């Protein structure tokens, strides 16, 4: 399948159409610098990270625990800490919270959480009250802990079966997983779909995001990478690609075979 990249012109942040700049102070938890990829001793543990613009942390309500209390979408905002947009909700009891922006939700729409609410985009309710075939996001794995699955921009899981105390869901990765029917989920798909198909426009945008350039191992010296060295444009000289530390790369399974959650996975991700 051919994926078309949409170039952003101009390259400034003025192209974020339809977002608001309002920032309620009680929902900002402080500043956060981009991670440098270092541990406590200053040693690089994750490569290609560093720099980046300072960020303000928004308090996102993944639990959606205002049961049977309706709220209205006041703003749709850009969040530098995620690809998805967020929207500010004003509840009738005076509470204000940020939630992930569901695709298709508009300013002025009303949302609500609870076990007996209607199946509407943005509403949150337990899986046992949701009909089969519904697209969902912000899925809980543990009841009451808050949504942990399908939270990226454009992500959506599908409810395909319910049996006993468990529901079977198809996750965005293609994984089929059992989740308790008492866990909550939000109806609809996460907004800002297609963000991964947009060209950033210039290299500087990548640096604003805290990502540094990636150098191929083939052009390094042998002391720096297993693929390095040779005369001229030489091949890697190995049966399969290796990581900088000599371990197999590109397809090596890294998940533990005896992980506790294996019993909840009907089919692993593709």
Swiss-Prot record:
Its main location: plastid. GO terms for cellular component: mitochondrial large ribosomal subunit; plastid. GO terms for molecular function: RNA binding; structural constituent of ribosome; transferase activity. Residues 221-245 are annotated as: Disordered. It holds the Pfam family Ribosomal_L2. One of its GO terms (biological process) is mitochondrial translation. Keywords: Plastid, Ribonucleoprotein, Ribosomal protein. It is found in: Plastid. Part of the 50S ribosomal subunit. Belongs to the universal ribosomal protein uL2 family. PANTHER family: LARGE RIBOSOMAL SUBUNIT PROTEIN UL2M (PTHR13691:SF5), RIBOSOMAL PROTEIN L2 (PTHR13691). HAMAP family: Ribosomal_uL2_B (MF_01320_B). This is Large ribosomal subunit protein uL2c.
């Amino acid at each position: 399948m051919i994926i078309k990249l949409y170039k952003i012109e101009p390259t400034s942040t003025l192209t974020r159409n339809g977002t608001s700049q309002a920032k309620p102070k009680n929902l900002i938890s402080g500043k956060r610098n981009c991670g440098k990829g270092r541990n406590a001793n200053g040693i690089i543990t994750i490569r290609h990270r560093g720099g980046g613009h300072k960020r303000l942390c928004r308090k996102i309500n993944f639990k959606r625990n205002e049961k049977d209390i309706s709220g209205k979408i006041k703003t749709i905002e850009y969040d530098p800490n995620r690809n998805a947009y967020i929207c500010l909700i004003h509840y009738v009891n005076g509470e204000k919270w940020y939630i992930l922006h569901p695709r298709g939700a508009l300013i002025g729409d009303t949302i609500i959480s609870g076990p007996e609410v209607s199946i509407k985009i943005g509403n949150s309710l337990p899986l046992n009250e949701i009909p089969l075939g519904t697209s969902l996001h912000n899925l809980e794995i543990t009841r009451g802990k808050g949504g942990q699955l399908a939270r990226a921009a454009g992500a959506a899981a599908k409810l395909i079966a319910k049996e006993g105390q468990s529901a079977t869901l198809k996750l965005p990765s293609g994984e089929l997983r059992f989740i308790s029917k008492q866990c909550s989920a939000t109806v609809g798909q996460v907004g800002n779909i297609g963000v991964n198909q947009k060209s950033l426009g210039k290299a500087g945008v990548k640096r604003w995001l805290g990502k540094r350039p990636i150098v191929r191992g083939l052009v390094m010296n042998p002391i720096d990478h297993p693929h390095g060295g040779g005369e001229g444009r030489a091949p890697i000289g190995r049966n399969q690609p290796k990581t900088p530390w000599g371990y197999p790369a590109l397809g090596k399974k890294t998940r533990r075979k005896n992980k506790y959650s294996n019993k909840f996975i009907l089919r692993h991700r593709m």
